[in-house]
Amino acid sequence: MGTRLEATEQSNHRTQRNDIQLENAKAAGKMGISVDLEAKYAKLGLNLGAITFGEKDRKKMKNSHLRKQENANISLAVCALLNSGGGAIKVKIENENYSLTRDGLGLDLEASLCKCLPFVQWHLDFTESEGYIYIYVKSWSQEIFGLPIGTLRTNLYVRSMSSSVQVSAAAALEFLQDLEETGGRPCVRPELPASIAFPEVEGEWHLEDLAAALFNRTEFQYEETFPFTRSRYVEVTLLSAKRLRKRIKELLPQTVSAFANTDGGFLFIGLDGKTQQIIGFEAEKSDLVLLESEIEKHIRQLPVTHFCEEKEKIKYTCKFIEVHKSGAVCAYVCALRVERFCCAVFAAEPESWHVEGGCVKRFTTEEWVKLQMNAPSG
């Protein structure tokens, strides 16, 4: 019934690394960020295009996507300068009759900057001149922050309780250091000693056993109940056929990263977590082939970092289980079993930027890990 697939780790060939770097540089360009080669206001300057400033005018913005993009652009530019010795960002003021002193930046922009820097006032200064806002950025300080570079998002996930949680840069560094010290970890987790009883742990493992039994089924009945809930080892979601491919693209990287970096687990698509009923999603056989291909592609593209000699691939099993109603197939459940990984799996390249060769570039996972691991301690 099901088809077993194994995703391969991201290629380390130089050509692919160059492609990633080029793609990341293009991404910065699409966001309207460019290096100001004629900047007189700073040794290194970035142009950020036009942005609406001030709490009152930002609240009036009807385009929520644009508002989010402006937040992302400022955060990205600040991160790039922090990691490049400092500099300044030049931003054209989009709205008329604006005053930095009177109107401020806007609370959402301030919140975004606070996520970049816990001590904004130590590293950023703001001035207004002739229709522009200038954001002066000091260089990143490992002495202050305890980390070698600034990072907006690590994109490294673990499973915590019943959620996939992105770890902080500090936690990611600790996780990577532990892996380096031990040379990776066994792909099979150690068994719980029989002489030690931890009811809460045994309870979670029991949920995993129930999920494994469901995974091994060959068919379900429509609205049949299942006897477990979300846990460290299990994630369930109910998606319509229309939203399936889009949500798979969003859900899969984080979930696979979290399960792989913890102790493995199961993802069931087509189970209603609220009613604990098996519903499934409608699909043709051709749709399942396409979906399986999409899942394989997304997992194959996940960045990985190895500290072991074996350099295992991400291992998983994907299968589609029929859901029957009145004796006929009415839907399918997508069941994905992800194995515990030997080292680190990222949901995407870490969101950490720098300026190099006249371009704003995103560090590749390989570059980011090396910078984190090779930084002097203390």
Swiss-Prot record:
Its main location: cytoplasm. Keywords: Adaptive immunity, Cytoplasm, Immunity, RNA-binding, tRNA-binding. It holds the Pfam family B3R. Disruption phenotype: Conditional deletion in T-cells leads to impaired T cell-mediated immunity. T-cell show an accumulation of tRNA fragments, which inhibit translation and promote stress-granule formation. InterPro entries: Poxin-SLFN/SLFN_N, Schlafen, Schlafen_AlbA_2_dom, Schlafen_AlbA_2_dom_sf. GO terms for molecular function: tRNA binding. Induction: Upon interferon-alpha (IFN-alpha) treatment. One of its GO terms (cellular component) is cytoplasm. Gene3D superfamilies: Schlafen, AAA domain (3.30.950.30). It is found in: Cytoplasm. Mainly expressed in the thymus, lymph node and spleen. Transmembrane segments: none annotated. GO terms for biological process: negative regulation of cell population proliferation; response to bacterium; T cell mediated immunity; T cell proliferation; T cell proliferation involved in immune response; tRNA stabilization. tRNA-binding protein involved in T-cell mediated immunity. Plays a key role during the metabolic reprograming phase of activated T-cell, when T-cells produce reactive oxygen species (ROS): acts by binding tRNAs and protecting them from cleavage by the oxidative stress-activated ribonuclease angiogenin (ANG). Also required for T-cell quiescence maintenance. PANTHER family: RIBONUCLEASE SLFN12, SCHLAFEN. Belongs to the Schlafen family. This is Schlafen family member 2. The gene is Slfn2.
